[in-house]
Amino acid sequence: MAILFAVVARGTTILAKHAWCGGNFLEVTEQILAKIPSENNKLTYSHGNYLFHYICQDRIVYLCITDDDFERSRAFGFLNEVKKRFQTTYGSRAQTALPYAMNSEFSSVLAAQLKHHSENQSLDRVTETQAQVDELKGIMVRNIDLVAQRGERLELLIDKTENLVDSSVTFKTTSRNLARAMCVKNVKLTAIIVVVSIVFIYIIVSPLCGGFTWPSCVKK
């Protein structure tokens, strides 16, 4: 169970997004965003084995896609946290921003919060308040049919193996960077030891050679 995809948009204009795995998220999300009214509201759409949860506030839509067995309270907890961070960071700038204007910065925030709320099940249950439970009861769940441009029924297609490939690449990259960092650290340490050794030998030998210029040891 996980949050598979998250997006922040103004109407159908996507401002930032992050996907946990491969899939036709954008194609499906564009249709979902087009169906969301501009007034403040919260709703969950059900489509096949997936749920689309969203919060719309001040024309900005915070939306995530989850498996149908993922707890709705955790999904809306994620969306509320994303909304708070986005509003704090960008404020009214989001009302006039160009498509993907916040993606380079905010996609990493989406990734971190997506990971946190997907993995920390016990924490969410402990911190969940009665007010949150009552709020969730008021959020409706509606079935939705999606139609592709060709007129065919549109299905959300997920490729979770892509996440495994990405994780493998990330692991290899991290290992390579770690090895490089350790090599640089060892070179620096060796250089420091050599310099300290030379200085130490110089200090020890100088009195025996008549001073710091070694007059009795250096032949003129």
Curated annotation (Swiss-Prot):
Chain segments annotated as transmembrane: 189-209
Superkingdom of origin: Eukaryota
Keywords recorded for this protein, A-Z: Acetylation, Coiled coil, Cytoplasmic vesicle, Endoplasmic reticulum, Endosome, Exocytosis, Golgi apparatus, Lysosome, Membrane, Phosphoprotein, Protein transport, Signal-anchor, Synapse, Synaptosome, Transmembrane, Transmembrane helix, Transport
GO BP annotations listed: calcium-ion regulated exocytosis; endoplasmic reticulum to Golgi vesicle-mediated transport; endosome to lysosome transport; eosinophil degranulation; exocytosis; Golgi to plasma membrane protein transport; natural killer cell degranulation; neutrophil degranulation
Residue ranges of domain v-SNARE coiled-coil homology in the record: 125-185
Subcellular location: Cytoplasmic vesicle, Secretory vesicle membrane; Golgi apparatus, trans-Golgi network membrane; Late endosome membrane; Lysosome membrane
Longin domain sequence ranges: 7-110
PANTHER family noted in UniProt: SNARE PROTEINS, VESICLE-ASSOCIATED MEMBRANE PROTEIN 7
Purpose: Involved in the targeting and/or fusion of transport vesicles to their target membrane during transport of proteins from the early endosome to the lysosome. Required for heterotypic fusion of late endosomes with lysosomes and homotypic lysosomal fusion. Required for calcium regulated lysosomal exocytosis. Involved in the export of chylomicrons from the endoplasmic reticulum to the cis Golgi. Required for exocytosis of mediators during eosinophil and neutrophil degranulation, and target cell killing by natural killer cells.
Subunit comment: May interact with STX17. Component of the SNARE complex composed of STX4, SNAP23 and VAMP7 that binds SYT7 during lysosomal exocytosis. Component of the SNARE complex composed of STX7, STX8, VAMP7 and VTI1B that is required for heterotypic fusion of late endosomes with lysosomes. Interacts with PICALM. Interacts with RAB21.
Protein name as catalogued: Vesicle-associated membrane protein 7
Source organism of the structure: Rattus norvegicus (Rat)
Gene giving rise to this polypeptide: Vamp7
